[in-house]
């Protein structure tokens, strides 16, 4: 069953069970591209925005109070996820996001009119009052981006950080061999090594919390090209204040609306911090899977949980699957960063027209990282243990302990001891005594692996 909807191009039939109107239907038919829906976070952000603009327009005497209340009620339904099925459009549409803006306008008007009566609320004249797609879509981008960071990504960073803190403390006095250039180096403790991973999380959280302030200023109030045509002079300030009340986030009105419409450097900047997190997560996961390599022919200093059979042909194999998953996510996020960077450069004249692909990739990065960090934490990090016997053996076998002799006998003599031990496949102690450079007592006094860690 269908109904007829109308816009400036004429009539078009729409599924009678759906709440969208003519412009949404045209977009649905004209842009059957891929299967990437406009992120629902953007729809919810639009609903927050439309609720705020309705309140401000009513306060300014432009919109009837009854209409503002009806619009706000529908917006609440959208935010609560009750109307998700009525937002069918894909990311691959107009670069300004106009069609998704109109999708939201049409659904709000349609549902509100079910209560007020047909034709009472118009999607353009009422729901979109004092607005343009050109300032609403970038505003929705910032609302959605900030909310996703606060509710999804930052909590997962904190949780992973806490697990690493626990592991760090547990193994702070377990001496192991350090490695630089993939070669043996001087000793440190496993706790010290893990503290480096922990600091990666701590610092990246700080980078994000600092950078995300850049997306608090909003474009709303700029309307079509940044001049604020058809909106009151302080409309942006009032809407930002209302959004702050609704969300609890300290949004402000961007001081330069021309910038806010044509540049997405704030989003690009914040995603740079997200990319940095992805880089460090790849480093941490790679360290763990290499240190857990084996069990008999690899490094084998760490043991990871056996979550599932590792091979379809080799029985008993345990693979570092969580490490592999999160490193693939990290690679995807790095690719997303390239896309965002290129798209952010396309602010021709007064408007960037790559907005949907920017926010799509931004939100995807957050979701993938948050999900993979949760999975990695629960299924790998929490069950990660040290193979203390293997670690002790490798410390005792290491030639790099000779570095501790440098202050006592000099670099060249210490190097000769290490070379002799390597060439004759003996222990460092045996080689040191054989050279006559040190006595057994001196060796035992000066070669103290725990002391070498400077704990």
UniProtKB/Swiss-Prot annotation:
The active site is at residues 181, 311. One of its GO terms (cellular component) is cytoplasm. It comes from the Bacteria. InterPro entries: Fum_hydII, Fumarase/histidase_N, Fumarase_C_C, Fumarate_lyase_CS, Fumarate_lyase_fam, Fumarate_lyase_N, L-Aspartase-like. The record marks 324 as: Important for catalytic activity. One of its GO terms (biological process) is malate metabolic process. Belongs to the class-II fumarase/aspartase family. Fumarase subfamily. Homotetramer. This is Fumarate hydratase class II. It comes from Listeria monocytogenes serovar 1/2a (strain ATCC BAA-679 / EGD-e).
């Amino acid at each position: 069953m269908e109904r007829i909807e109308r816009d400036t191009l004429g009539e078009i039939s729409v599924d009678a069970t759906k709440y969208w109107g003519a412009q949404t239907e045209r977009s649905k038919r004209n842009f059957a591209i891929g299967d990437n829906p406009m992120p629902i976070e953007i729809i919810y952000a639009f609903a927050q925005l439309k609720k705020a603009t309705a309140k401000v327009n009513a306060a300014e005497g432009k919109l009837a109070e009854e209409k503002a209340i009806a619009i706000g009620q529908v917006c609440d339904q959208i935010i609560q996820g009750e109307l998700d099925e009525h937002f069918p459009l894909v990311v691959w549409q107009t670069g300004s996001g106009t069609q998704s803006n109109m999708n939201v306008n049409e659904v709000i008007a349609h549902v509100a009119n079910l209560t007020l009566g047909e034709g009472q609320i118009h999607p353009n004249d009422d729901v979109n009052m004092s607005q343009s797609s050109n300032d609403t879509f970038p505003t929705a981008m910032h609302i959605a981006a900030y909310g996703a960071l606060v509710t999804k990504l930052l909590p997962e960073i904190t949780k992973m950080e806490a697990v690493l803190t626990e592991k760090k403390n547990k193994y702070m006095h377990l001496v192991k061999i350090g490695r630089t250039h993939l070669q043996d180096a001087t000793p440190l403790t496993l706790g010290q090594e893990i503290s480096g991973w922990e600091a990666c999380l701590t610092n990246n959280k700080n980078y994000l919390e600092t950078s995300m302030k850049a997306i608090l200023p909003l474009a709303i109030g700029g309307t079509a090209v940044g001049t604020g045509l058809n909106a009151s002079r302080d409309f942006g300030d009032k809407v930002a204040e209302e959004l702050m009340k609704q969300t609890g986030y300290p949004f402000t009105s961007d001081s330069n609306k021309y910038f806010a419409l044509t540049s997405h450097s704030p989003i690009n900047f914040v995603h740079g911090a997200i990319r940095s997190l992805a880089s460090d997560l790849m480093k941490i996961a790679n360290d763990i899977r290499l240190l857990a390599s084996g069990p008999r022919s690899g490094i084998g200093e760490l043991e990871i949980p056996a979550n599932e059979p590792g091979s379809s042909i080799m029985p008993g194999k345990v693979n570092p699957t969580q490490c592999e998953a999160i490193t693939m996510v990290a690679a995807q996020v790095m690719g997303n960063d390239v896309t965002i960077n290129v798209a952010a450069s396309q602010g021709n004249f007064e408007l960037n027209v790559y907005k949907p692909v920017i926010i799509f990739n931004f939100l995807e990065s957050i979701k993938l990282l948050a999900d993979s960090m949760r999975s990695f934490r629960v299924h790998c990090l929490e069950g990660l243990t040290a193979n203390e016997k293997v670690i002790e053996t490798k410390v005792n076998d290491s030639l790099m302990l000779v570095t501790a002799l440098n202050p006592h006998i000099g670099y060249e003599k210490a190097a000769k001891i290490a070379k002799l031990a390597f060439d004759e496949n003996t222990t460092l102690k045996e080689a040191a005594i054989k050279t006559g450079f040190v006595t057994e007592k001196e060796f035992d006094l000066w070669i103290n692996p725990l002391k070498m860690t400077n704990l």
